[in-house]
Amino acid sequence: MIERFLKQTHFTSEQDFKEHLEFIIPEDFNFAYDVMDEWAKIKPDHVALLWTSERGEEIRFTYQDLKEQSDKAAAYFQSLGIGHDDKVMLILKRHYQWWLAMLGLHKLGA
C-alpha cells in the first residue's frame, strides 16, 4: 500500500532517502478510509493498536476492530449533526476511545 503514497519506496542510503523522499497525497486523502480501512481489507486480524492503561490493563484492536468502531463513531457524530469541515475539540485523557473517535471524525471530514 505504501506505493500509493510515496513516489519512491527503495533507497540506497540515508542521504538518498533525505534527498528523494516525496509523498503523493491525493486532494481527497482521508487517513481513516485511505489507510486504516485499507489495512482492514488487507490484514483485518492484525493488531493495529495496543492500548495500555496506567494500571497495566491492555486492550488490543485489530484493523477490523478499528474500522468497525470508527464507522460506529462516525455514524454517531453524524447523528449529532457533525459533518465535513466542522471543527471538533476532542478531549479524552489517555483513553483508547480517543483513537476510535478521531478516526470516526476523519471519516466525516470534520
What is the predicted role of each segment?
Residues 12-21:
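Short, contiguous pre-domain boundary segments
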Residues 106:
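Anion (oxyanion) recognition and catalysis
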Residues 45, 49-103:
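Conserved AMP-binding/adenylate-forming core of the ANL superfamily
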Residues 22-27, 94:
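Active-site diphosphate/adenylate-binding microenvironment
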Residues 109:
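Structured binding elements
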Residues 1-8, 27-49:
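A short N-terminal helical cap/helix-turn-helix that marks the beginning
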Residues 21-22, 37, 64:
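Short alpha-helical interface patches
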